Swiss-Prot record:
Keyword Repeat recorded: yes
InterPro entries according to UniProt: EamA_dom, WAT1-related
Compartment(s) where it occurs, according to its Swiss-Prot or TrEMBL record: Membrane
EamA domain span: 27-134, 196-325
Membrane-crossing residue ranges in chain numbering: 16-36, 45-65, 71-91, 107-127, 142-162, 187-207, 216-236, 254-274, 282-302, 306-326
Keywords, in A-Z order: Membrane, Repeat, Transmembrane, Transmembrane helix
Descriptive protein name: WAT1-related protein At2g37460
Amino acid sequence: MEEVKKRDCMEKARPFISMVVLQVGLAGMDILSKAVLNKGMSNYVLVVYRHAVATIVMAPFAFYFDKKVRPKMTLMIFFKISLLGLLEPVIDQNLYYLGMKYTTATFATAMYNVLPAITFVLAYIFGLERVKLRCIRSTGKVVGTLATVGGAMIMTLVKGPVLDLFWTKGVSAHNTAGTDIHSAIKGAVLVTIGCFSYACFMILQAITLRTYPAELSLTAWICLMGTIEGTAVALVMEKGNPSAWAIGWDTKLLTATYSGIVCSALAYYVGGVVMKTRGPVFVTAFSPLCMIIVAIMSTIIFAEQMYLGRVLGAVVICAGLYLVIWGKGKDYKYNSTLQLDDESAQPKLELSGNGKDNVDHEVITISKQGEQRRTAVETV
């Protein structure tokens, strides 16, 4: 009995642990990416190398482990995979990196917290989320969505005084990038468009998994298509600049390898697995943890300055985000209860006879929601 309880507890905690570990990995990617972007690495080339590494890592696992579960590739599934490779690896990541160039790693990560709100709206439009305004859990999700949008606007438009942290004292303002309002607005717009693209990716991934329920294979395909499509974009954007493709045994290679393995290969796979049970909104609901880690590390490594207005905006975003999480948690419990009720409501028929071919009567027992009724039926 004790073992069963432990197993159930671990089963319930697994999605939460997976998402927390994933956010720690994403925070490391943000720090490394900001470092190589500051050194002049092309974000378009970084995206290509990142997904090339992810494809090489995931392809053998997908080929071996998905042999029995991989469905037949159809034209519609391939179209969806091609679109998935465009939405997240190409559009979202390039816009996110560009937004980070104009601002800071902390700002870009904090702005990314509007992702669950955008995902929630799109999930509602595509019928993956239910909203009943008279129900408190739905109200919480709607209010939380509005709060995240308001917090993003505060972060973008309100700067406020500099917060003097003991490890950033004496750092001059010119050492911090992206502190003016124009850079903030430009970066916020780019990151927000990237968030919308990523939200579309999450919704389409959830839909694709219904007809192609092989997570490893889907991840490998997305990374491959992201590499091909990203290469086409990079060749156009870096035309006449072959030096942009140069890479050696340095932080560029480390960033591409780390991002490819942890933040593309593992992130797509883990996100797909958790999404099948918890939905796309749950998967995107842990981004504030990444923001906190990046904010602390950025002030130490890059000497980024913290502004009161942006901290307040981030707090509002987090508050709204956890309202969405609270509503999703209530949804999950409610749906689980309904499923149990439906299972217990199904009638069970038990036929008992005297063991002979020709019987005088049979007793049919109908059990429904704990109630038993016995009816004697005489047969000819």
